A protein has these predicted regions:
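Extended, low-complexity, acidic/polar intrinsically disordered regions
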Residues: 1-221
Length: 221
């Protein structure tokens, strides 16, 4: 194994460990009295049970000892994508899935995220487009999680794909929705939208020339 491969494996292990630590904190809330804490935790437990069951049913060589390796970031991402894209997913499960997605995404390899970005973006566009469509406390948390997903998706768009952000209607529409939340009456939602805009427009890779900089200035004028 060469140096590059060693670094790649090390980074993957670090991301897995970081995600496991984050999910462990959520898992402990499965018996919480607060619905917006309990629901994502219970969904996480259900997802992990499904992933473990799938791992145990995979065919193996006759003499190979069964060793079930914990699911990694990509497996969690695929499970959440499946829930978010299903037509029969309830509003509550959708909301919990978006929250878990905001936790998982930063730990998934950028190439995998880019391959799934269009579907994931569509999944979070709905709550952003209807920011008052649910119970107040649950909706606040759902919006902040959706903004976290958008930030993660924007963060991994390479500079060479500038035209994707400039031309794709879904991206433009989502950015406009984010800008609208910058003047939302709810302080936590407004603050999270401000953070997203500030972080994305100031990313060093774009050298202060992000595709949405002018659009944001025109909106603020």
């Amino acid at each position: 194994m060469n140096t590059a491969d060693t670094v790649s494996v090390s980074n993957a292990q670090e991301q897995r460990e970081a995600l496991m630590n984050a999910l462990e904190r959520i898992r402990h809330l499965k018996d919480s009295k607060l619905e917006n804490q309990r629901a994502p935790a219970q969904l996480l437990v259900a997802i992990e049970a499904t992933l473990a069951e799938r791992a145990n049913t995979q065919p193996q060589e006759p003499q190979q000892e069964r060793q079930t390796e914990p699911a990694g970031p990509t497996q969690y991402l695929l499970a959440l994508e499946s829930l978010l894209s299903a037509e029969n997913t309830s509003a509550d499960v959708h909301a919990s899935s978006v929250y878990l997605l905001s936790i998982v995404l930063p730990h998934v390899a950028p190439g995998v995220v880019r391959a799934k970005s269009h579907a994931l973006l569509g999944a979070v566009a709905a709550p952003l487009a209807d920011p008052h469509g649910g119970a107040a406390e649950n909706m606040n948390a759902r919006l902040r999680a959706s903004l976290g997903v958008v930030e993660s998706l924007l963060h991994i768009v390479p500079v060479r794909e500038r035209n994707v952000l400039e031309r794709e209607r879904t991206w433009l529409a989502v950015w406009d929705l984010v800008l609208g939340l910058c003047i939302d009456a709810r302080p936590k939602v407004r603050r999270r939208a401000h953070e997203l805009v500030t972080h994305i427009l100031s990313e060093p890779a774009w050298e202060h020339a992000h595709p949405y900089a002018d659009r944001t200035m025109m909106w603020a004028a």
